[in-house]
């Protein structure tokens, strides 16, 4: 994923890719190249617009490691894709090509490899020629923003935090990364 600044310039305390959990008033465009699994897909889901290269793969493979996509991926993917498609991605952890992501509406454009930054900047130029206050207001209304918070996301974050606690304390959460590091298939215990 190509990110000019990987943090909000006015909120360095949010850390790398911190805008997944915070509302940004200006339009955000993800320029994605290569593999965007886990956090890369979660950044794309948190962005207003997404431009991806032909070779790009999207996915939330956390379940393959005994984890869940805790940076908004689980509750956002069902808003971006048809429910059955989203559930397949969540349950299998398998990746989706940029062509399929475009077909299902997860992204806005697929561009030739090596051109994603230029394409994202061209899209930004089409936005910046419009009245900023109207663009920002349109974003707030479309996202259901009240007092700088996307109100629908609050419930999703609450559920995610509640579930991640139990998952992270599980034996499976230890086994998944261990098996990955040892280059073997995990032995799940459901505990």
Model-inferred region functions:
Residues 89, 141, 145, 162-168:
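Helix-loop "lid/cap" segments that line or gate small-molecule binding pockets
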Residues 15-25, 31, 37-91, 104, ...:
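CoA-thioester-processing core
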Residues 178-191:
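Terminal low-complexity tails and localization/encapsulation signals of metabolic enzymes
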Residues 169-173, 179:
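Interdomain hinge/lid region at the active-site interface
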Residues 1-2, 48:
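Beta-strand-loop-alpha-helix segment that lines the small-molecule cofactor/substrate pocket
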Residues 51-56, 98, 107-158, 171, ...:
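C-terminal long alpha-helix characteristic of the crotonase
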Residues 4-33, 65, 154, 158, ...:
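An acidic, glycine-rich surface segment that forms the CoA-thioester-binding/catalytic face
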